[in-house]
Amino acid sequence: MLFHYLYPLHTEISFFNLFRYITFRTIYGGLTAFLICFLLGPWVINRLSRMQIGQFIQNDGPETHFEKEGTPTMGGILILFSLGVSTLLWADLTNHYILITLLSMLLFGAIGFIDDYLMQVKKRNMGFTARGKFLVQIMAGLVISYLVYLCPDFDTSLSIPFLKNFTPDLGIWYIPFATLVIVGTSNAVNLTDGLDGLAIGPIIIAGVTYMIFAYVASHITIASYLQVKHIASCGEITIVCGILAGAGLGFLWFNAHPAQVFMGDTGSIPLGAILGTIAVITKQEILLLVVGGLFVIEALSVIIQVGYFKLSKGKRVFRMAPLHHHFELKGWPESKVIVRFWIIAITLALISLSTLKIR
């Protein structure tokens, strides 16, 4: 919005020429998102507390979690609001990738909100049924994937890390593949969101990482030098990534241990979907397995635990899944689990960035 209204004034006032630069709008978009979260956070937390929308702790969880009972949840509203407003202010709203990313946030945000609403307000213990939620996510993912597929400059070939000459073209089959990426990431982030700041930290890290990927892909000279597929229109996604990181930092101010608020499904489900959508748009969908490796590990721990439990008729691989609970039950303090998982996320992000040179 600011781009559309202020940039045309650059012929009269040279300062407004800054608004044509993606780097400028990325930095100030991120700062705007941070400030919105930081300033509105206390009001949102107080409002959620007054509405008695508090976290429910299951009896089979770690004992240290019982003190979290009643902590305001559905704080994802704060993240999505700051993300949406900042994107509307700083991004080019005529860019189709921006509109698709915003739609992804709205669709999956609605799914997460309804799930939280059923649990917290209507007091349905588990919200959506697992099958029902997955079906709705698939439908939303198909819509987003189809819209990306229709974009005139979008390529349905895959970018395989370390194999620059191997780019299989999926054609129409890219739609179900992209749906799998978006829905899978959405659920993986949701599973990771079990400790104070555990999910939002890696989201910030992934946002910064994809900010670099998006900028590289949109810059024809850099993309050519690094042998990365050039996608001119995805430059605006750089701004969304910066805003995602800024909103995440603003939320982390209140979500850091001991948390004053939890994001709930209202935050984790759409944030994962946004990350998956960005990975698809920037043609770094395979590399998301590395960038979001922590989310992958957490999701795999649940799959392994459930599968082994059924096959072995009651035996477990981990003391509890997702994996972060396993380490808690081994005696690790919550803060140690969180920071060590963040370190893993940073390491994986650095490895993924190295693929820009190792091709």
Curated annotation (Swiss-Prot):
GO terms for biological process: cell division; cell wall organization; peptidoglycan biosynthetic process; regulation of cell shape. Pathway: Cell wall biogenesis; peptidoglycan biosynthesis. Its cofactor is Mg(2+). Its main location: membrane. It is a multi-pass membrane protein. The keyword Magnesium applies. It catalyses: UDP-N-acetyl-alpha-D-muramoyl-L-alanyl-gamma-D-glutamyl-meso-2,6-diaminopimeloyl-D-alanyl-D-alanine + di-trans,octa-cis-undecaprenyl phosphate = di-trans,octa-cis-undecaprenyl diphospho-N-acetyl-alpha-D-muramoyl-L-alanyl-D-glutamyl-meso-2,6-diaminopimeloyl-D-alanyl-D-alanine + UMP. Its EC number is 2.7.8.13. GO terms for molecular function: metal ion binding; phospho-N-acetylmuramoyl-pentapeptide-transferase activity; UDP-N-acetylmuramoyl-L-alanyl-D-glutamyl-meso-2,6-diaminopimelyl-D-alanyl-D-alanine:undecaprenyl-phosphate transferase activity. The chain crosses the membrane at residues 26-46, 73-93, 98-118, 134-154, 166-186, 197-217, 234-254, 261-281, 286-306, 338-358. Keywords: Cell cycle, Cell division, Cell inner membrane, Cell membrane, Cell shape, Cell wall biogenesis/degradation, Magnesium, Membrane, Metal-binding, Peptidoglycan synthesis, Transferase, Transmembrane, Transmembrane helix. It is found in: Cell inner membrane. GO terms for cellular component: plasma membrane. It comes from the Bacteria. Pfam families: Glycos_transf_4 (PF00953), MraY_sig1 (PF10555). PROSITE patterns: MRAY_1, MRAY_2. Belongs to the glycosyltransferase 4 family. MraY subfamily. Catalyzes the initial step of the lipid cycle reactions in the biosynthesis of the cell wall peptidoglycan: transfers peptidoglycan precursor phospho-MurNAc-pentapeptide from UDP-MurNAc-pentapeptide onto the lipid carrier undecaprenyl phosphate, yielding undecaprenyl-pyrophosphoryl-MurNAc-pentapeptide, known as lipid I. This is Phospho-N-acetylmuramoyl-pentapeptide-transferase.
